[in-house]
Amino acid sequence: MTLSNNIKNKKDNWNYIWKKKSNQIKAKNIKDLLFLNGWDANLSKFSVKSWKNFVNYFISKNKINKSHTILEIGCGAGAFLLPFYKKNIKCYGIDNITNFIKICKNFMPKAKFYTAEANNLKIVKKIKFDFIFCHSIFQYFPSKKYANQVLKEVLKFKTKKNKIFILDIPDYKKKKNYISQLKRQIGKRKYKEKYSKNMHQFYNYEYFVKIVKKNNYKIEKLTKNLLNKKTSRYRFNVIIY
């Protein structure tokens, strides 16, 4: 999970939380990777089968095969990349949590993983990617300024043929409903303890449209609930092509 180094030493931020999470268990299977990636909360729980179906949707829909090279920005413990890797697809992953990168390398020794920030992708700048994924990371960015930097950096890799997927983006238009649901689910006290200093970033679809079209690329909104989890109704996905 990729966040800004500017805040990584403060305990009350997502970066600290993910560092702590990365050391909670010794991962032995994809279920453990999902736990380390934070998919254990009541609102975001789902089965391993649902997860595999979710990832395989992108593989089959886009006819991704072993001739392709993919990059995941904010790869966490590697749960999203693992199904690609098992199909002999060339995988690259970036995250700024060192322990997550170690876990990824352990599960996918032939893939390439790097410790880096999402807004500075120089380490892979010479590589041409057929597909780039940012799954469920934009909510953890410290500011819209940082998100702008990430989008600018990611779009440097855009070509006429490749695609960029930004997935599981919190919808600003549904923010109030999401917070209400969260409070009902975990209680107002726990909500305040957990989110008073670490609230997610929310985005309008128009935010992405403006930046993408400014760079003369096309963008598509995908609202279909591809993953069977409760938070999906408050999220959207974008495809840049």
Where are the language model's segments positioned?
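Short helix-loop-beta connector
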Residues: 63-68
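Class I (Rossmann-like) S-adenosyl-L-methionine-dependent methyltransferase catalytic domain
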Residues: 2-62, 73-89, 95-110, 115-121, ...
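Class I S-adenosylmethionine-dependent transferase superfamily signal
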Residues: 84, 153-154
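Helix-to-beta-strand junctions that scaffold the AdoMet/dcAdoMet cofactor pocket
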Residues: 141-142, 158-160
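Short amphipathic alpha-helix with an adjacent loop that forms part of the alpha/beta core around
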Residues: 121-127
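A short, conserved alpha-helix within the catalytic core of class I
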Residues: 141-153
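A conserved beta-strand element that flanks and buttresses the S-adenosyl-L-methionine
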Residues: 133
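Short catalytic micro-motifs in class I SAM-dependent methyltransferases
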Residues: 136-140
